[in-house]
């Protein structure tokens, strides 16, 4: 976002390998208001941390907010401790679409306990200038586990927002027969 206007630029190349991309972004620093880093996994792109450090050195960080979507498989401790505190606001949204073995299936070779440990470290830095959320994209693979997921996230202490998968349509929950979906909203009853 520059001067109140959201900018969409033609993709120059895969950012990690494109010097032109980083030069273009650096030229925009004086007017930047917001940076949005989304997946793949933005914490694996070292150049973006270099960019943030340049912004801090230019004394522009206090005017810029940052948003991340991450899968919680990486823990950027240096940024947590030394870079992000300089920025106006940082929000990190963890893309978590399942628990335990469901997470590991979707994010192979990631390990659930590692992701939970990483999110726990992030929670230590939660503040008015640093906010955490879990984005749970609901699809045909995880909709039946939604109550369990919401219970876990409430206990874990990071707010969740639900995102409905739209594409591909055959993974959208609207393809599930109505009678099957009813079971999701019914509380579990003991056998009597």
What are these model-predicted stretches?
Residues 182-192:
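Single conserved hydrophobic/aromatic residue that forms the stacking wall/gate
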Residues 49-53, 76-84, 145-147:
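Distinct, well-ordered alpha-helical segments
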Residues 170-181:
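PAPS-dependent sulfotransferase catalytic core
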Residues 21-24, 51, 115-118, 149:
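Alpha-helical packing segments of well-folded alpha/beta enzyme cores
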Residues 1-17, 29-46, 58-78, 85-117, ...:
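Core AdoMet radical
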Residues 26, 56-59, 84, 123-126, ...:
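N-terminal cationic-hydrophobic initiation segments that often serve targeting/anchoring roles
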């Amino acid at each position: 976002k520059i001067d109140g206007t959201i900018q969409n630029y033609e993709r120059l190349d895969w950012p990690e390998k494109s010097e032109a991309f980083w030069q273009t972004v650096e030229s925009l620093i004086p007017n930047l208001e917001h940076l949005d880093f989304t997946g793949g996994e933005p914490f694996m792109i070292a150049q973006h941390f270099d960019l943030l450090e340049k912004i801090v050195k230019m004394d522009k960080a206090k005017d810029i907010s940052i948003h991340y979507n991450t899968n919680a498989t990486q823990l950027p401790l240096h940024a947590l401790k030394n870079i992000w505190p300089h920025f106006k606001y940082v929000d990190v949204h963890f893309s978590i679409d399942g628990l335990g073995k469901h997470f590991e299936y979707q994010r192979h070779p990631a390990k659930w306990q590692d992701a939970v440990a990483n999110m726990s470290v992030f929670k230590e830095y939660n503040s008015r200038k640093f906010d955490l959320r879990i984005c749970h994209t609901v699809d045909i693979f995880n909709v039946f586990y939604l109550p369990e997921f919401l219970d876990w996230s409430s206990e874990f202490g990071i707010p969740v927002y639900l995102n409905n998968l739209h594409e591909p349509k055959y993974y959208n929950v609207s393809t599930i027969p109505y009678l099957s979906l009813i079971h999701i909203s019914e509380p579990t009853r003991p056998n009597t």
